[in-house]
Amino acid sequence: QGPGRQPDFQRCGQQLRNISPPQRCPSLRQAVQLTHQQQGQVGPQQVRQMYRVASNIPST
């Protein structure tokens, strides 16, 4: 929950940039599920943040 969590999302966004757009949604879903498994629970806030990071990725 602390400010130290932010780099995780940025690193996640960095990795998502390397994924071609067709694979991006499944990969994002997988990332959400993985985070859910690791932390036990992912709140709506974290999910929103993940999607916000992902939606800021330019499609190239």
UniProtKB/Swiss-Prot annotation:
Going by the UniProt record, its keywords in alphabetical order are: Pyrrolidone carboxylic acid
**Matches recorded under InterPro entries:** Bifun_inhib/LTP/seed_sf (IPR036312)
User: According to the UniProt record, where is the region Disordered?
Assistant: 1-21
Q: Which Gene3D superfamilies match?
A: Plant lipid-transfer and hydrophobic proteins (1.10.110.10)
Residues with PTM Pyrrolidone carboxylic acid: Q1
Polar residues: compositionally biased ranges: 12-21
What does the protein in this record do? Is used as flocculent to purify water. The flocculation activity may be explained by the patch charge mechanism, due to the high charge density and the low MW of MO2.
The protein's name is Flocculent-active proteins MO2.1 and MO2.2
